[in-house]
C-alpha cells in the first residue's frame, strides 16, 4: 500500500438501508390483535361470605332465642325457673294424674301443694326479684284489713326479660286454668272442679295484687317526679323573687 493512497478508499461503505415507508399504524393493524381479557369476579367468595354471615346470624339467633337464651339473658334465672316450674307442674299433674294413678286423694293433695308453693313463691320470691313488686294483706288494731304494696326503687329498673316473662306467666296460666274448668264442666268431671277453682283463686289473687302493686309503684314514681320538678321550679322562683325584692328595696331607699 502506497502512502499517497487516501485512507477512506480502503474502508468499505456500509450497506444501504431503506427507511421504512408508509403508515406505522397500518403495519401494526396488519398483525392480528389479541382478544381482550375480561376479568369477571367469581361468586365463590361472596357465597362463602354469605354462608358465613348466615351461619353467624343463625348462631346469634340460637344464642338469643329459645329457652336457653331467655335464661341466659335473665338476671335471676333461678327465680324465673321456679316460677314456671311450679305452675307447669301443677297443670301437668292435674292433667296426667289419671294416667298414672287412680288415687284421687294423692292427686288432689299433690296439685294443691304445688299450687300453694306457686302462690307463695310468686308473691314473695318471683315478684320481688323479677319485677321488684310485693304485696300482702295486713290487719290493723281495729280489725280492718288493707293491702300493702311494696316496690323497688325506680333508679333500679327490672331486667326486661325477667319483667316480660313474669307478666306472661302471671296472665297466661289463669287462662289455662279457666280452659280446664270449662273442659271439666263439659266432661262432667265435678270431682276435679274444686281443684281448678282453688287454682283460679290463687292465680287471680296474684294477678290482682301485682297489677295494683305495679299501678301503685308507677303512681308513686310519677308523684315523685312531679313533686321534684315543682320543687325545683319553686326554688328557682323563690331565689328570683328574693333578688328582685332586694333590688327594688335598694332602689327605693338607696
Curated annotation (Swiss-Prot):
Places the protein is found: Golgi apparatus membrane
Biased composition (Low complexity): 40-59
Disulfide bonds, paired cysteine numbers: none
Keyword terms, alphabetized: Golgi apparatus, Membrane, Transmembrane, Transmembrane helix
Coiled-coil regions listed: none
Residue stretches spanning the membrane: 80-100, 104-120, 166-186, 190-210
Pfam families documented for this protein: DUF846
One GO term (biological process): protein secretion
Entry annotated with the keyword Membrane: yes
Domain of life: Eukaryota
Polar residues bias (residue ranges): 18-27
Membrane topology field: Multi-pass membrane protein
Primary residence: Golgi
Region (Disordered): 1-59
Protein name: Golgi apparatus membrane protein TVP23
Taxonomic source organism: Coprinopsis cinerea (strain Okayama-7 / 130 / ATCC MYA-4618 / FGSC 9003) (Inky cap fungus)
Highest classification ranks of the organism: Eukaryota, Fungi, Dikarya, Basidiomycota, Agaricomycotina
